């Protein structure tokens, strides 16, 4: 563990490099329930870090000496200066996390430490010395980065060579000789310092690129195997050496899809995809076709990760003690990531698709659910996909509680310790049921945030009133996505909403031929529900505000009374 760190905030006048310390201890990594539990900010031995300033400087000197053939005292004095900082941000709760993301939307933030070696997933980071109110997040930033109000710690000074950007066209591969313009530009910017000017001159004079330096450092520290696939040589073949193994820089992306068991293959829309390795990461989001493109061009193999998170909600593993975020990895590739997810991962995608549509997609003009602001934080949606018992029960364990305590339902929205809790069970359920259930439960949080002062006020509303609204949401969303509706209607989950909308004289449960009401829009109905606190109040609101004969509506007060009486007395 670090024996001391420098903590900074916006008002701190200290240099961000003051108080910097390094640890020579590798972290102890525990495995609990298949989860990689990391307890230190520094994971692998810093002495073997290929991106440390010391090792990159040693590698640079070795390359210059190898090409000059002269053991120059002048060369031995050459030293690189850090161009990146490895940072731990200390966000003050979800409000602080929102503040950090709003300050710099380009930051690629991780909930676990970064390392020069691959990290086994799923991983969680636990620092018992931090108060529960603090959310630690890890990132790398340029050395001259202008920090915002979020407190932070400098964990390491680094010299990073990627990306290959300025010398390359967006669509074409970079030439083999292309150097990292980001790193070169940094050296040039600091060339006013005599040491930096000398470094640039020596590198230029000897024809040494920063890519050569990085190769040397990776080789010198024993990390080359993590960056390229070993060569398979035929008899008589000579091995390819140096940067030729990597070839040219390449822009990487791909297309992500999933299988809906009723609709077939569907695009995975809006998911955040990170791509990179070690300390250098970039991110993109999948478009309407599930396609994405990671910024910049890469000479090494990179790791991809699809993250089911957004500013307003995220999916987490309901079975885990640690509640780690759901994510899908595709590691160690220098090619596009094109994959169609099946099984449990496809079910995660269905939950995500429903939530993403309600928050950001076509929601038919309805009010959006809760948004992530300083007073309203993102919603964690617990997904239970391995078994039914963890969802059904609330199980005390040696650690925190796991389970939802949701009984035989498929989804649950409740107040837990004064906060919202949402659980979705995908185990044994069809894509349609998962999609519909997710819409139903998100509808509850939308109802709450658009109408109520507190969770207790919301849950004081009649149970049947709340679930009539969310059953109606299932009706319209399900009909739009699947072209048909497969729902049941009972006393607390009434069919009033489809009966107000359709022109079928039968009630939504098919039992009575009394429905003479038609033509209402879901937007009209939602306004009536959000303005009232019971089904009877909703009926009065409709009579007073939505006259028959306008906007396609057709009904008499008697017909409306008869329809509501049926569902209230079923």
Segments (PLM) and residue ranges:
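Bacterial Sec-dependent N-terminal signal peptides
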Residues: 3-32
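Pan-zinc metallopeptidase signature
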Residues: 44, 53-57, 71-77, 493-570
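Short, ordered, surface-exposed loop/turn motifs in non-cytosolic proteins
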Residues: 63, 251-279
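Short, acidic Ser/Thr/Gly-rich low-complexity loop/linker segments typical of extracellular
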Residues: 275-294
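Auxiliary, metal-adjacent structural segments of Zn-dependent hydrolase domains
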Residues: 349-420, 424-427
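Short pre-active-site segment immediately N-terminal to the catalytic Zn-binding motif
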Residues: 422-438, 461
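Active-site recognition of the HExxH zinc-binding catalytic motif
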Residues: 436-453, 467-471, 475
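Post-HExxH zinc-binding segment in Zn-dependent metallohydrolases
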Residues: 457-501
């Amino acid at each position: 563990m670090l024996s001391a760190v420098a903590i900074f905030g916006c008002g701190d006048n200290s240099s961000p490099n003051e108080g910097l310390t390094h640890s020579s201890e590798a972290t102890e990594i525990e495995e609990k329930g298949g989860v990689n539990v990391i307890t230190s900010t520094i994971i692998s031995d810093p002495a073997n870090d290929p991106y440390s300033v010391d090792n990159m400087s040693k590698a640079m000197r070795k390359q210059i000496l190898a090409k000059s053939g002269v053991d120059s005292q002048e060369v031995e004095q050459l030293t690189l200066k850090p161009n990146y900082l490895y940072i731990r941000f200390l966000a003050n709760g979800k409000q602080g996390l929102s503040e950090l993301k709003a300050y710099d939307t380009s930051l690629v933030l991780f909930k676990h430490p970064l390392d020069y070696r691959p990290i086994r997933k799923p991983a969680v980071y636990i620092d018992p010395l931090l108060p529960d109110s603090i959310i630690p997040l890890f990132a790398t930033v340029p050395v001259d980065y202008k920090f915002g109000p979020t407190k932070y710690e400098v964990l390491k000074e680094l010299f990073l060579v990627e990306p290959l950007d300025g010398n390359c066209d967006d669509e074409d591969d970079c030439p083999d000789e292309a150097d990292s313009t980001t790193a070169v530009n940094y050296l040039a910017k600091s060339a006013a310092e005599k040491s930096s000017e000398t470094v640039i001159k020596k590198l230029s004079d000897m024809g040494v690129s920063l890519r050569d330096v990085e190769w040397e450092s990776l080789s010198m520290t024993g990390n080359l195997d993590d960056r390229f696939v070993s060569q398979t040589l035929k008899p008589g073949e000579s091995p390819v050496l140096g940067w030729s193994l990597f070839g040219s820089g390449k822009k990487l992306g791909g297309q992500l899809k999933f299988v809906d068991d009723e609709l077939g293959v569907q695009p995975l829309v809006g998911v955040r995809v990170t791509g990179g390795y070690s300390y250098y990461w970039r991110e993109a989001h999948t478009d309407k076709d599930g396609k994405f493109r990671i910024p910049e061009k890469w000479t090494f193999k990179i790791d991809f990760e699809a993250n089911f998170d957004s500013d307003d909600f995220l999916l987490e593993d309901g079975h885990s003690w640690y509640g780690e975020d759901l994510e899908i990895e595709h590691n160690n590739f220098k090619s596009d990531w094109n994959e169609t997810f099946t099984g449990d991962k496809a079910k995660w995608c269905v939950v995500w698709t429903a939530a993403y549509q309600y928050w950001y997609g076509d929601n038919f003009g309805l009010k959006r659910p809760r948004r992530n602001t300083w007073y309203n934080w993102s919603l964690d949606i617990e997904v239970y996909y391995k078994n039914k018992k963890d969802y059904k029960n609330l199980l005390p364990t040696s650690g925190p509680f796991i389970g939802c305590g949701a009984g035989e339902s498929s989804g649950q929205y409740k107040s837990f310790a004064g906060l919202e809790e949402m659980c979705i069970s995908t185990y044994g359920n069809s894509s349609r049921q998962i999609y519909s259930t997710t819409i139903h439960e998100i509808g509850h949080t939308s109802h709450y945030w658009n109408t109520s002062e507190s969770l207790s006020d919301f849950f004081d509303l009649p149970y049947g009133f709340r679930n009539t609204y969310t059953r109606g949401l299932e009706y319209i969303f399900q009909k739009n996505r699947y072209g048909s509706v497969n729902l049941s209607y009972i006393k607390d989950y009434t069919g009033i909403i489809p009966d107000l909308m359709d022109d079928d004289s039968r009630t939504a449960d098919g039992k009575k031929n009394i429905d003479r009401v038609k033509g209402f829009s879901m937007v009209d109905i939602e306004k009536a529900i959000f303005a009232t606190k019971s089904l009877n109040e909703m009926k009065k609101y409709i009579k007073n505000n939505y006259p028959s004969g306008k906007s396609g509506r057709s009904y008499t007060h008697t017909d409306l009374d008869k329809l509501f009486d049926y569902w209230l007395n079923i």
